[in-house]
Amino acid sequence: MRRDSDKYTQFGLVRDMLAATAIVERFDAQQALDTAEAIASVGRLLMTGEGSSRIFPAKNAIAHARRRGWKLELHTEAARQSQEYDLDGWAVFALSNSGRTREVIELFSKLQQRGHEQLYSLTAFANSKLESLANKGYVLAC
């Protein structure tokens, strides 16, 4: 695929994919060091969300961890299904572009009501409902 071909670059998805490299290069991993340490101390992480907000990032993280032999139990599941599970002793990381995904909000609301202390979020918008429910929220700055 040629980066300068209108045949492809007319589509937002293609433009986003082409921009991804620069975004990853600018990512400051130090900003999440405290979260990474907290998750490592728990030893188990569920990555949740709905659709493409969750599937690619979570499956990529799981594959990366397995290739490197990390001693961290990683799982991914849709937020609605995750509501059926006992998540005591798990860190839960919700991925939602809008930060308003209904199923994710319901899951985090229930976990927060139960006093769950390992709730993290990643959204594209600051001050979202999801971020307000998380113990620590991250906002994409791209």
Description of each model-found segment:
Residues 40-142:
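Glycine-rich phosphate-binding loops that contact phosphosugars or nucleotide phosphates
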Residues 1-34, 39-40, 119:
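Cofactor-/ligand-binding subdomain signature composed of acidic, glycine-rich
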